[in-house]
UniProtKB/Swiss-Prot annotation:
Descriptive protein name: Imidazoleglycerol-phosphate dehydratase
Pathway info: Amino-acid biosynthesis; L-histidine biosynthesis; L-histidine from 5-phospho-alpha-D-ribose 1-diphosphate: step 6/9
GO molecular function term, any single one: imidazoleglycerol-phosphate dehydratase activity
UniProt xrefs under SUPFAM superfamilies: Ribosomal protein S5 domain 2-like
Reactions this protein catalyses: D-erythro-1-(imidazol-4-yl)glycerol 3-phosphate = 3-(imidazol-4-yl)-2-oxopropyl phosphate + H2O
Annotated HAMAP family: HisB (MF_00076)
Claim: Nuclease is one of the keywords in the record: no
CDD domains (alphabetical): IGPD (cd07914)
InterPro entries: IGPD_sf, ImidazoleglycerolP_deHydtase, ImidazoleglycerP_deHydtase_CS, Ribosomal_Su5_D2-typ_SF
Stated family: Belongs to the imidazoleglycerol-phosphate dehydratase family.
GO biological process, one term: L-histidine biosynthetic process
GO cellular component: cytoplasm
Main location: cytoplasm
Length: 207
């Protein structure tokens, strides 16, 4: 998947090994939403599958982590690796729309996500839960994943659940809204295919 595609952004792969996790990620940003996700954390797999399906990003994740302790390292490190792969795939960010946003309803829940491929990573997270766990995951870990993804991908990311009651619906709408915003942000602008979407001629400063 580590290739540049003629009509879009392209693909990339990342391998990230630490004493806590071993993770291999491949993405194709010009895909159709095909996924193969195995993190060892069932609910995280479910969320990453939603990310792939609704962004149309093909996503392969193979992770081995210290889940006998808890899911923290696998969750955070998968966010880092996916973010790194996305950043590698978009490269110098020439031709992309850069900005993306989405509102996603899920029954009683409504979530808004806005992002900027600014190369100035930042996360605003306005999401709260009424339970400590969803499935096999601590709810506090979802912020860790979004933080890790934003930092590694080099995106400014705002995630806000406007209202909702069901905790599963809340977090799933966050991933689906991220997916739709990501899809919009990486879309190629045919009028500016060879231009970086910034008056500076480059994006970022800290990365």
């Amino acid at each position: 998947m580590d290739q540049s595609l003629a009509n879009g952004v392209g693909g990339a792969s990342i391998e990230r090994n630490t004493t806590e996790t071993r993770i291999r990620v491949a993405v194709n940003l010009d895909g159709t939403g095909v996924y193969d996700v195995k993190t060892g954390v069932g609910f995280l797999d479910h969320m990453l599958e939603q990310l792939s399906r609704h962004s149309l990003m093909d996503l392969s994740v193979a992770a081995e982590g210290d889940v006998h302790i808890d899911a923290h390292h696998t969750t955070e490190h998968s966010g880092i690796a996916i973010g790194q792969a996305v950043a590698k795939a978009v490269g110098d960010r020439k031709g992309i729309q850069r900005y993306g946003h989405a509102y996603v309803p899920m029954d009683e829940t409504l979530t808004r996500v806005a992002l900027d491929f600014s190369n100035r990573p930042y996360l605003i997270w306005k999401v709260s839960f009424s339970r400590d766990k969803i499935g096999d995951m601590d709810t506090e870990l979802f912020r860790e994943w979004f933080q890790a993804f934003a930092m590694a991908a080099g995106v400014t990311l705002h995630v806000e659940c406007l209202y909702g009651e069901n905790n599963h619906h809340i977090v799933e709408s966050c991933y689906k809204a991220l997916a739709r915003a990501l899809r919009a942000g990486i879309e190629i602008d045919p009028r500016k295919r060879d231009a970086v979407p910034s008056t500076k001629g480059t994006l970022g400063g800290s990365l």
